[in-house]
Amino acid sequence: MEEFKRYIELDRSWQHNFFYPLIFQEYIYGFAYDHGLNKSILLENAGDKKYSLLIVKRLINRMYQQTHLILSANHSNQNDFFGHKHKKNLYYQIISEGFAVIVEIPFSLLLISSPEAEENQIVKSHNLRSIHSIFPFFEDKFLHLNYVLEILIPYPIHLEILVQTLRYWVKDASSLHLLRFFLYEYRNWNSLITPQKSNSIFSKRNQRLFLFLYNFHVCEYESIFFFLCNQSSHLRSTSFGALLERNYFYGKLEYLVKVKTFTKDFCLILWLFKDPFLHYVRYRGKSILASKGTSLLMHKWKYYLLNFWQCHFSLWSQPRRIYINRLSKHSLDFMGFFSSVRLNSSVIRSQMVANSFLIDNRIKKFDTIVRIIPLVGSLAKAKFCNVLGHPISKSVWTDLLDSDIIDRFGRICRNLSHYYGGSSRKKSLYRIKYILLLSCARTLARKHKSTVRAFLKRLGSAFLEEFFTTEEEKVLSLILPRDSSISGGLYRGPFWYLDIICIHDLANDE
């Protein structure tokens, strides 16, 4: 973002959130190219044709020469701005990528320049970026909680809701009209939330723009949620202060109190949130609300959220999208893990003079288990095994060198071990590694027209076992004690890595 500040300071229009002129600047598309990496439309399109920034210059010149542009899907035949139809989608992609960078500017600059960010060094802390930092938080807090709400956040049915929520920050009407143009050109934007059900251009090319819009939409409702929690508990929150403009939310809350049908007193709403043990986390479209309160309080939360979405955001959500579960009896399905709170019993014999008695200690423990069935399904889809989990050869890799084949299998295995290192039970993870190991052996045996047994006998099974041992396990063998109860094996406890910033593809079965 320092690069953005250096370029944008040349033009004072950004201070008033007027971003439409930036669409005509070439360096914006250069930033989009750098951040998009190999997924950028500036690199390649569906036809594998290479593109450079020269096409951006042609596009900008065409925009300068255009006197007017009809922003209506019903008049697409009259719109000769983009020329031929095969160029139309390409130009849409280029402008949308540049626009995605532009709309992120005010929020990124505000986060960097925020006194709270400088005071708490939020930006400098790389560990806070890790999605796995959520699980140590679970381990610390969930042992003392009773109930949890699993919430599937609804997304806007009407695209105008996205524009209306963004207009509080972006004062430039031209930019908002351009945003409407993108939204109505690709109407099936919710395919980003359920990518397996759609092959739309959204899910493949415009993820940056629409992920931003979706996260901003969620941030709007979360902001009021945090505000109510702060007002009720009189605690200061720093997690969202750098991103929110309090004046707007005070006005929204006054409107919220007026339109609510289930309460007329703002104090009653605050009383609902008076829970010092309330914790909230979110990843993508799923959020977790955990509390030490009773079942009655969690039902109040459930119906408050349903009414809040409907009254304030015109979103209708079914009650079955919010599940109320007791932590001691149900597992939490979140980010590729089954998490639960279970009781560990330990019996201690105590001897006092001539009498002895047993003491049964029950200790709560936060347990995380790898979701084995979705992982096997993902491996079967990638042709590493069948649907029953039996390893098969990867036939498309038989033309590669032996070292390349082993390297590819080993990289997948190390990535899985890295992502699922926090699992408290490694048996499922070892089963996945075993499938990959035998799939690698079958692939090499098929390439050399041999059997797996003969191939392993010639190479030695220790070779593959040594290769599939991760670097982390080698380091842990030096710094952590060995578990004497498992034949001198390595430490098998949970180990969370705080350098993971996105969910693993094989963990995301949605």
Swiss-Prot record:
One of its GO terms (biological process) is tRNA processing. One of its GO terms (cellular component) is chloroplast. Its main location: plastid. It comes from the Eukaryota. InterPro entries: Domain_X, Maturase_MatK, Maturase_MatK_N. It is found in: Plastid, Chloroplast. The keyword Transit peptide does not apply. The keyword Endoplasmic reticulum does not apply. Keywords: Chloroplast, mRNA processing, Plastid, RNA-binding, tRNA processing. Pfam families: Intron_maturas2 (PF01348), MatK_N (PF01824). One of its GO terms (molecular function) is RNA binding. Usually encoded in the trnK tRNA gene intron. Probably assists in splicing its own and other chloroplast group II introns. Belongs to the intron maturase 2 family. MatK subfamily. This is Maturase K.
